[in-house]
């Protein structure tokens, strides 16, 4: 929370999860009621019985289970919905009223997420084109401007109005078909006289009114038939009927003419209409007014619309998505109730409201939505920052939106209306760049689905601060002072001339002309970009990489908060939910690793802590108590720190001593040289938890059994199993060990037994095992300590809900060669070598550096902010200070960042009596020495303490080797991929490279022994064991045989022949 003395309320940053909470609360408070009111009264075919809902008395019950239990048992954290319903007999005027169970609605927890089947899921906000009308101009093949007006419905359907060279207006209802606007207006219910009375240019409409057109619009029925014929592309003469009208209503009017409340508001504002907001359908009056504006465009009146402007977009929030799904569930329930009433009367049964309603439609609709909808995603829980940022994403993709392959560059680009609403930096990389953005820290969603940004109003009459939230279209009418002018300090005399924005242009104006100013210098950035210190000195592409890489940082076993930050670290940690915070004041009466007992107001509150919990990225989420027994605490005080948090602040990495210099080529191309101190002192050690699970089913031959008596397996592999056949807690397991012993029964014929088995059965009566071993084994690359075993029993004894056993294994990973590290300025690299600390370059006080970066990685990438952070971090480490600097500090004075860094370095050198910290000849640099020889390097080197992160891309998850494994059935070549223990493909270009070097024997091995020559690869193993020479393959490999078979399928016979060396006879041999 950032405050200014005068304007405390204005300077408070809103909660980062607020957008999710507000959306869900709006759904519970308004969306449920709106959809329930739409539920119709249902009558039977004889209209004797009527079913209706009494919406005023619906209630949501408190969940029966806790969040932790839902995660543990793979259940949904939901609330039961109960609604009063009545059944009315019209003949006797009797009514039976009951409170019925409608189904379960998943609830949102304190993190802004939902727990569905034990998995944390989050709903992403979607950016859609706002319903309404938009005017555009395009050039035809002759270079002449063609003006069109596009009407977009609430469903996303589009209809176009266009005007040709002869000033005739057409309505295009499909890509190929277009009809006269007179026909469309007549089909919607207007006659010719009403049309001419409601337009501004009746003479233009009369100019293309031919006798043929008059016949088409002579009556409403003729207009509907003409419209249907053009819309449905139907030949002949269709006959007017009720079914034809219903088809038009369903296919055209419902999908393309329903504007909704937002569309009606936009249509009224764009066309200057005064139609009621409750009238949400497209009217003939709208069509005629749109045609008038289109004619005005043709003659140079009016302005065209920018489709990419945020005022023409709307946010489809969590509330809208959940409300749409609830409405869909009610439609399904309506069909069920209608069918049940008819069925009950047909069988002469007396229905009750309880019997008519089933909870299946609502429950299954939400389960399928959270599990299958593209905007419902599994919560990324790599670190606390990732959890917050994921809920603040804005996606142009999804149902009704764009696709990554068809979106143009203009849509992906930054727009001036994004200022203060969508971060211009934080977006995904790759095919979805510009299509998935992030919400700015101060932005909020308005009433009409628009993104609003706060501004500080400058008023001469009142000296008090007043903050305005403006939608995208409104701030263009004000002179808005840019972010480099002072926004907080009211006592400083303002500059006479300031840069400002006005109508998407940047101007330089006098201070007296400014209407609005920014709240903060980083109010237009997302959370990820706002955590980058000195971001103003970086190229935007590198800042984008940094925003993404901070979300990939692994929580370390010993976290450390950054020396140089921006001030948002504390709020990011608090809003992430990683910390345990006191909800009431009181006294600590007990602390333990798994809970804290707080006594206050006569009650004792138990606060559970997270103990070694696995995230979906296999990182470790853990909380450590920070309070002692007997201490009195206040509301809001931190009780326990979580993963990647220290002192209530976000702590994703470590402050390490870094030198920017080349070292024997080991930091070539962004490689990083590190000291062994980072390994032995567990500086970058992290814990990772993997989950392995197995289910027990009931087969046709009988149930599967979990047991520790597994035949034909070595006792060494079963050493960790308990008497139930499940691995014991605390066991150390290696690759190939049995985690859960399981036997599956199978049908075995008498003839398939081995002779010795049949002999044992005949003589001794010993039953031979007929079960197949289907144990859960630890796969390749897995090793560690078993920290948890969960045996989830099936509920209700149903065979369709099998038992599930989950084993959680913790793995300790030190930093090693091949791991990826990164700074906060897009400077990333791979560990290339780990040097002994005595060989690392050392400073003038004898301290060896921890990392060596390549200095050539800074100038071409233009991320100079890392140099400022590096030098300021060195000063902070020597002075034991932490700096929190807001970006764009040059608004105070020129070269403010450089002056701050140099002054702190000078003070650090003065207080610690180390003059080498700041040397005026080369400030920020220092003479350092080679650890191998003790000689100083030729040039002074930049040294410092930047904040370096260890990323999730680790070599243990990627390194792979294959000696033997599975082969594809058709080609007999090794499979592909690490998960399948696959091989590496030697393709066409690799063969060319080997041919170019003339390595014939290596090439033959690659194409035969190591690939798809079945007999040759079987002989290799034996000859390798006995030390013999590998025999040359005598026949063709399997890939050549496959080619021959494919040619035979095309009726082409291919054979090869051998010519005898003795008599030169040709011997034919089958391929």
Curated annotation (Swiss-Prot):
<dbReference type="InterPro" id="IPR007645">
    <property type="entry name" value="RNA_pol_Rpb2_3"/>
</dbReference>
<dbReference type="GO" id="GO:0003899">
    <property type="term" value="F:DNA-directed RNA polymerase activity"/>
</dbReference>
<protein>
    <recommendedName>
        <fullName>DNA-directed RNA polymerase subunit beta</fullName>
        <ecNumber>2.7.7.6</ecNumber>
    </recommendedName>
</protein>
<dbReference type="InterPro" id="IPR007641">
    <property type="entry name" value="RNA_pol_Rpb2_7"/>
</dbReference>
<dbReference type="GO" id="GO:0005739">
    <property type="term" value="C:mitochondrion"/>
</dbReference>
<dbReference type="Pfam" id="PF04565">
    <property type="entry name" value="RNA_pol_Rpb2_3"/>
</dbReference>
<comment type="subunit">
    <text>In plastids the minimal PEP RNA polymerase catalytic core is composed of four subunits: alpha, beta, beta', and beta''. When a (nuclear-encoded) sigma factor is associated with the core the holoenzyme is formed, which can initiate transcription.</text>
</comment>
<keyword id="KW-0934">Plastid</keyword>
<dbReference type="InterPro" id="IPR037034">
    <property type="entry name" value="RNA_pol_Rpb2_2_sf"/>
</dbReference>
<keyword id="KW-0548">Nucleotidyltransferase</keyword>
<dbReference type="Pfam" id="PF00562">
    <property type="entry name" value="RNA_pol_Rpb2_6"/>
</dbReference>
<dbReference type="InterPro" id="IPR042107">
    <property type="entry name" value="DNA-dir_RNA_pol_bsu_ext_1_sf"/>
</dbReference>
<dbReference type="Pfam" id="PF04560">
    <property type="entry name" value="RNA_pol_Rpb2_7"/>
</dbReference>
<dbReference type="GO" id="GO:0006351">
    <property type="term" value="P:DNA-templated transcription"/>
</dbReference>
<keyword id="KW-0150">Chloroplast</keyword>
<dbReference type="InterPro" id="IPR014724">
    <property type="entry name" value="RNA_pol_RPB2_OB-fold"/>
</dbReference>
<dbReference type="GO" id="GO:0009507">
    <property type="term" value="C:chloroplast"/>
</dbReference>
<keyword id="KW-0240">DNA-directed RNA polymerase</keyword>
<dbReference type="InterPro" id="IPR010243">
    <property type="entry name" value="RNA_pol_bsu_bac"/>
</dbReference>
<dbReference type="GO" id="GO:0032549">
    <property type="term" value="F:ribonucleoside binding"/>
</dbReference>
<dbReference type="GO" id="GO:0000428">
    <property type="term" value="C:DNA-directed RNA polymerase complex"/>
</dbReference>
<dbReference type="Pfam" id="PF04561">
    <property type="entry name" value="RNA_pol_Rpb2_2"/>
</dbReference>
<comment type="function">
    <text>DNA-dependent RNA polymerase catalyzes the transcription of DNA into RNA using the four ribonucleoside triphosphates as substrates.</text>
</comment>
<dbReference type="InterPro" id="IPR007120">
    <property type="entry name" value="DNA-dir_RNAP_su2_dom"/>
</dbReference>
<keyword id="KW-0804">Transcription</keyword>
<dbReference type="InterPro" id="IPR037033">
    <property type="entry name" value="DNA-dir_RNAP_su2_hyb_sf"/>
</dbReference>
<dbReference type="InterPro" id="IPR007642">
    <property type="entry name" value="RNA_pol_Rpb2_2"/>
</dbReference>
<dbReference type="InterPro" id="IPR007121">
    <property type="entry name" value="RNA_pol_bsu_CS"/>
</dbReference>
<keyword id="KW-0808">Transferase</keyword>
<dbReference type="GO" id="GO:0003677">
    <property type="term" value="F:DNA binding"/>
</dbReference>
<dbReference type="InterPro" id="IPR015712">
    <property type="entry name" value="DNA-dir_RNA_pol_su2"/>
</dbReference>
<comment type="similarity">
    <text>Belongs to the RNA polymerase beta chain family.</text>
</comment>
């Amino acid at each position: 929370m950032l405050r200014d003395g005068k304007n405390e309320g204005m300077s408070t940053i809103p909660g980062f999860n607020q957008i999710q909470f507000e959306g869900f609360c709006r759904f519970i408070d308004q969306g449920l009621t709106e959809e329930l009111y739409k539920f119709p009264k249902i009558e039977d075919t004889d209209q004797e019985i009527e079913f209706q809902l009494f919406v005023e008395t619906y209630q949501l019950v408190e969940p029966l289970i806790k969040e932790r239990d839902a995660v543990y048992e793979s259940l949904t954290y939901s609330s039961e919905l109960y609604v009063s319903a009545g059944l009315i007999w019209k003949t006797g005027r009797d009514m039976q009223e009951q409170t019925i169970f409608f189904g379960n609605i998943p609830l949102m927890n304190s993190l802004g997420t939902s727990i569905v089947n034990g998995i944390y899921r989050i709903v992403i906000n979607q950016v859609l084109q706002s319903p309404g009308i938009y005017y555009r101009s395009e050039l035809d093949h002759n270079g002449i401007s063609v003006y069109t007006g596009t009407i977009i419905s609430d469903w996303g359907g589009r209809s176009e109005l266009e005007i040709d060279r002869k000033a005739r207006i057409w309505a295009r209802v499909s890509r190929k078909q277009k009809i006269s606007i007179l026909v469309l207006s007549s089909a919607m219910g207007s006659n010719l006289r009403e049309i001419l009375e409601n337009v501004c240019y009746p003479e233009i409409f009369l100019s293309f009114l031919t006798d043929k057109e008059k016949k088409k619009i002579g009556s409403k029925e003729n207009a509907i038939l003409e419209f249907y014929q053009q819309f449905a592309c139907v030949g002949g003469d269709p006959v007017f009927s009720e079914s034809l009208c219903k088809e038009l209503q369903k296919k055209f009017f419902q999908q393309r003419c329903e504007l909704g409340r937002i569309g009606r508001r936009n249509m009224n504002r764009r066309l200057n209409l005064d139609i009621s907001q409750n009238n949400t359908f497209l009217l003939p009056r709208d069509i005629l007014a749109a045609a008038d504006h289109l004619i005005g465009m043709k003659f140079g009146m009016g302005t065209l619309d920018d489709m990419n402007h945020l005022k023409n977009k709307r946010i489809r929030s969590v509330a809208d998505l959940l409300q749409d799904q609830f409405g869909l569930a009610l439609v399904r329930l309506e069909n069920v109730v209608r069918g049940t009433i008819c069925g009950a009367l047909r069988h002469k049964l007396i229905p009750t409201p309880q019997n008519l309603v089933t909870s299946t439609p609502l429950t299954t609709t939400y389960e399928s939505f959270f599990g299958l909808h593209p905007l419902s995603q599994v919560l990324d829980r790599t670190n606390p920052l990732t959890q917050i940022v994921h809920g603040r994403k804005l996606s142009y993709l999804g149902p009704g939106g764009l696709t990554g392959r068809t979106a143009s560059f203009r849509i992906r680009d930054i727009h001036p209306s994004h200022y203060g609403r969508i971060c211009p930096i934080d977006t995904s990389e790759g095919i979805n760049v510009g299509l998935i953005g992030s919400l700015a820290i101060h932005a909020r969603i308005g009433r009409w689905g628009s993104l609003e940004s706060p501004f500080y109003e400058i008023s001469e009459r009142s000296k008090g601060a007043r903050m305005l939230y403006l939608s995208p279209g409104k701030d263009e009418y004000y002179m808005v002072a840019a972010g480099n002018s002072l926004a907080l300090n009211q006592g400083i005399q303002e500059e006479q001339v300031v840069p400002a924005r006005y109508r998407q242009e940047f101007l330089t104006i006098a201070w007296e002309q400014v209407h609005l100013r920014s709240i903060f210098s980083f109010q237009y950035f997302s959370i990820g970009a706002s955590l980058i210190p000195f971001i103003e000195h970086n190229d935007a592409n590198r800042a984008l990489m940094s925003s993404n890489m901070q979300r990939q940082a692994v929580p370390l076993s010993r976290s450390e908060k950054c020396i140089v930050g921006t001030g948002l670290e504390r709020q990011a940690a608090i809003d992430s939910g990683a910390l345990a915070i006191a909800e009431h004041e009181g006294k600590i009466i007990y602390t333990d690793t798994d809970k804290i007992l707080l006594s206050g107001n006569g009650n004792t509150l138990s606060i559970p802590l997270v103990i070694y919990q696995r995230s979906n990225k296999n990182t470790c989420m853990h909380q450590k108590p920070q309070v002692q027994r007997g201490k009195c605490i206040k509301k809001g005080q931190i009780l326990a720190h979580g993963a990647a948090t220290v002192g209530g602040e976000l702590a994703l990495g470590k402050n390490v001593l870094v030198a920017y210099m080349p070292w024997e080529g080991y930091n070539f191309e962004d490689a990083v040289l590190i000291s062994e101190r980072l390994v032995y002192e567990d500086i970058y050690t992290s814990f990772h938890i993997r989950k392995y699970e197995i289910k027990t089913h009931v087969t046709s031959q009988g149930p599967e059994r979990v047991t520790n008596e597994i035949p034909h397996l070595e006792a060494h592999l079963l050493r960790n199993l308990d008497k139930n056949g499940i691995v014991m807690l605390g066991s150390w397991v290696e690759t190939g060990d049995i985690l859960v012993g399981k036997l599956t029964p199978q049908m075995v014929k008498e003839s398939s037994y081995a002779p010795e088995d049949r002999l044992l059965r005949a003589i001794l009566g010993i039953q031979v095992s007929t079960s197949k071993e289907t144990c859960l084994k630890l796969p390749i690359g897995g090793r560690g300590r078993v920290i948890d075993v969960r045996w989830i029993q099936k509920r209700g004894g149903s065979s369709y809900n099998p038992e599930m056993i989950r084993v959680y294994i913790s793995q300790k990973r030190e930093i090693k060669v091949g791991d990826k590290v990164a700074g906060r300025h897009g400077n990333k690299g791979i560990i290339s070598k780990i040097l002994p600390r005595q060989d690392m370059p050392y400073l003038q006080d004898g301290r060896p550096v921890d990392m060596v970066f390549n200095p050539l990685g800074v100038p071409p990438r233009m991320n100079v902010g890392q140099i400022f952070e590096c030098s300021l971090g060195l000063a902070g480490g020597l002075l034991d200070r932490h700096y929190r600097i807001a970006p764009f500090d040059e608004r105070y004075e020129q070269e403010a960042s450089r002056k701050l860094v140099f002054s702190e370095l000078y003070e650090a050198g003065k207080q610690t009596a180390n003059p080498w910290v700041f040397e005026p000849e080369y400030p920020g640099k220092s003479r350092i020495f080679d650890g191998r020889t003790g000689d100083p390097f030729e040039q002074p080197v930049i040294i410092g303490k930047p904040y370096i992160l260890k990323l999730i891309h680790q070599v243990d998850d990627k390194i792979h080797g294959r000696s033997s494994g599975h082969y594809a059935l058709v080609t007999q070549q090794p499979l592909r991929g690490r998960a399948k223990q696959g091989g590496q493909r030697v393709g066409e270009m690799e063969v060319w490279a080997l041919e170019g070097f003339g390595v014939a024997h290596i090439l033959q091995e690659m194409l035969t022994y190591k690939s798809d020559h079945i007999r040759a690869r079987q002989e290799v193993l034996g000859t390798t064991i006995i030390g013999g020479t590998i025999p040359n393959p005598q026949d063709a490999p399997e890939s050549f045989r496959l080619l021959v078979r494919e040619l035979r399928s095309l009726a082409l016979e291919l054979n090869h022949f051998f010519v005898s060396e003795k008599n030169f006879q040709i011997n034919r041999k089958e391929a």
